C-alpha cells in the first residue's frame, strides 16, 4: 500500500445493489464497447442506451472523447496514459454500477490487459464486453473525425491501428461486425444479449 493510503479508510455504504434493484427494477451492468476508431462504438452505445432507456432502465454513457474533456484531460496518448485512461474509466464505471446504473462505455481500449483489469472490478454477470469489429480499411474510409488522415500525415503519432497496436478481444461476450450489420440490427443483437444475460442472473426490468 502506498504511504498516502495508510491513513485512508474505506467507508461502506448503507445502500446495496439489492436496494437499487428493488427501486430501479433492473440489475446494474457495464456494457463495454471496444474497437478501432471509426468502428461504430459510440454510435452503437448511444443507440443502445436509447433502447434501454425506453425499456425503463437507468442508464449512462461513458464516452472516450467526452471523458478526455474533463476527468482525463491531463492524459495524452502514450501507452502509459492510455492505460491510466482505461483504469480511471473502470473505476468510474464501478461507481455507477454500485448505484444500480446500466453503464455503456465506448472506448478503443486497445490493450487486452487493461480490459481484463476493468472486468476484474465487477461480478461476472455485471460485465459485458462487446467487440465492435470492423477492418482497418473500412474504419479508415469512414474516418468521421479525420483522425486517420492526420495519423497518415504524421500529425497524430501513436494512433491505434496505424502506428500503435490494437489487441483484439480474446473472449468477448459479443462480437458485432459493423462491416456487415447496420445500426438497427446491431442494437437489436446487443439488447437481446443484455436481456439474456440479465435473465440468467436476474431481471433486466421489473416486468421483463
From Swiss-Prot:
The active site is at 109 (phosphoserine intermediate). GO terms for molecular function: adenylylsulfate kinase activity; ATP binding. The keyword Cell inner membrane does not apply. Pfam families: APS_kinase. InterPro entries: APS_kinase, P-loop_NTPase. Its EC number is 2.7.1.25. ATP binds at residues 35-42. The keyword Transferase applies. Keywords: ATP-binding, Kinase, Nucleotide-binding, Phosphoprotein, Transferase. Pathway: Sulfur metabolism; hydrogen sulfide biosynthesis; sulfite from sulfate: step 2/3. GO terms for biological process: hydrogen sulfide biosynthetic process; sulfate assimilation. It catalyses: adenosine 5'-phosphosulfate + ATP = 3'-phosphoadenylyl sulfate + ADP + H(+). It is an enzyme of class 2 (transferase). Belongs to the APS kinase family. HAMAP family: Adenylyl_sulf_kinase. Catalyzes the synthesis of activated sulfate. PANTHER family: BIFUNCTIONAL 3'-PHOSPHOADENOSINE 5'-PHOSPHOSULFATE SYNTHASE, PAPS SYNTHETASE, ISOFORM D. This is Adenylyl-sulfate kinase. It comes from Geotalea uraniireducens (strain Rf4) (Geobacter uraniireducens).
Amino acid at each position: 500500500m502506498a504511504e498516502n493510503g495508510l491513513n485512508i479508510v474505506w467507508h461502506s455504504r448503507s445502500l446495496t445493489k439489492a436496494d437499487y434493484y428493488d427501486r430501479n427494477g433492473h440489475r446494474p451492468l457495464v456494457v463495454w464497447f471496444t474497437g478501432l476508431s471509426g468502428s461504430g462504438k459510440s454510435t452503437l452505445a448511444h443507440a443502445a442506451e436509447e433502447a434501454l432507456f425506453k425499456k425503463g432502465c437507468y442508464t449512462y454513457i461513458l464516452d472516450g472523447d467526452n471523458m478526455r474533456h474533463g476527468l482525463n484531460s491531463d492524459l495524452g496518448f502514450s501507452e502509459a496514459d492510455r492505460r491510466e485512461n482505461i483504469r480511471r474509466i473502470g473505476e468510474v464505471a464501478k461507481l455507477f454500477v454500485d448505484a444500480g446504473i446500466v453503464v455503456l462505455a465506448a472506448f478503443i481500449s486497445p490493450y487486452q490487459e487493461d480490459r481484463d483489469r476493468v472486468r476484474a472490478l465487477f461480478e461476472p454477470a455485471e460485465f459485458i464486453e462487446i467487440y465492435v469489429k470492423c477492418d482497418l480499411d473500412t474504419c479508415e474510409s469512414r474516418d468521421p473525425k479525420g483522425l486517420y488522415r492526420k495519423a497518415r500525415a504524421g500529425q497524430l503519432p501513436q494512433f491505434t491501428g496505424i502506428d500503435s497496436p490494437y489487441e483484439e478481444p480474446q473472449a468477448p461476450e459479443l462480437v458485432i461486425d459493423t462491416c456487415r450489420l447496420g445500426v438497427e440490427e446491431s442494437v437489436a443483437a446487443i439488447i437481446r444479449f443484455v436481456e439474456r444475460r440479465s435473465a440468467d442472473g436476474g431481471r433486466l426490468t421489473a416486468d421483463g
